[in-house]
Amino acid sequence: MTIEEIISEIENMSVSQLAELVKALEEKFGVSASMPVAVAAPVAGPAAAAPAEEEKTSFDVILKEAGAKKLEVIKVVREITGLGLKEAKDLVESAPKPIKEGVTKEEAEELKKKLEEAGAVIELQ
């Protein structure tokens, strides 16, 4: 398989499939795709926040339940993940499920706020 063929296959993957691929590559090769993001985060934020983030730099945003306003939650999930309507609906209906994995604390808090405003119950891990 050529590099172009691999890239073509990756381009056709959904966001959730890409997340699974990244996780599998991280486990297979013992690396972390979130490390460059974690290194860049303290530079953008205040210096005082850096020591607190050293303990846990990578967070998963988990949808525990959609709540009463499921349609609003589906819209936000589509916005966050880039999934199609059916994929986002399936994801929301199969909660608890990860919405986004390996994100910075700042991004995780922002996503949690958006989803909770739409009516979802969210957990950060």
Swiss-Prot record:
<dbReference type="InterPro" id="IPR000206">
    <property type="entry name" value="Ribosomal_bL12"/>
</dbReference>
<protein>
    <recommendedName>
        <fullName>Large ribosomal subunit protein bL12</fullName>
    </recommendedName>
</protein>
<comment type="similarity">
    <text>Belongs to the bacterial ribosomal protein bL12 family.</text>
</comment>
<dbReference type="GO" id="GO:0022625">
    <property type="term" value="C:cytosolic large ribosomal subunit"/>
</dbReference>
<dbReference type="GO" id="GO:0006412">
    <property type="term" value="P:translation"/>
</dbReference>
<dbReference type="GO" id="GO:0003729">
    <property type="term" value="F:mRNA binding"/>
</dbReference>
<comment type="function">
    <text>Forms part of the ribosomal stalk which helps the ribosome interact with GTP-bound translation factors. Is thus essential for accurate translation.</text>
</comment>
<dbReference type="InterPro" id="IPR014719">
    <property type="entry name" value="Ribosomal_bL12_C/ClpS-like"/>
</dbReference>
<dbReference type="InterPro" id="IPR036235">
    <property type="entry name" value="Ribosomal_bL12_oligo_N_sf"/>
</dbReference>
<keyword id="KW-0689">Ribosomal protein</keyword>
<dbReference type="Pfam" id="PF16320">
    <property type="entry name" value="Ribosomal_L12_N"/>
</dbReference>
<dbReference type="InterPro" id="IPR013823">
    <property type="entry name" value="Ribosomal_bL12_C"/>
</dbReference>
<dbReference type="Pfam" id="PF00542">
    <property type="entry name" value="Ribosomal_L12"/>
</dbReference>
<comment type="subunit">
    <text>Homodimer. Part of the ribosomal stalk of the 50S ribosomal subunit. Forms a multimeric L10(L12)X complex, where L10 forms an elongated spine to which 2 to 4 L12 dimers bind in a sequential fashion. Binds GTP-bound translation factors.</text>
</comment>
<dbReference type="GO" id="GO:0003735">
    <property type="term" value="F:structural constituent of ribosome"/>
</dbReference>
<dbReference type="InterPro" id="IPR008932">
    <property type="entry name" value="Ribosomal_bL12_oligo"/>
</dbReference>
<keyword id="KW-0687">Ribonucleoprotein</keyword>
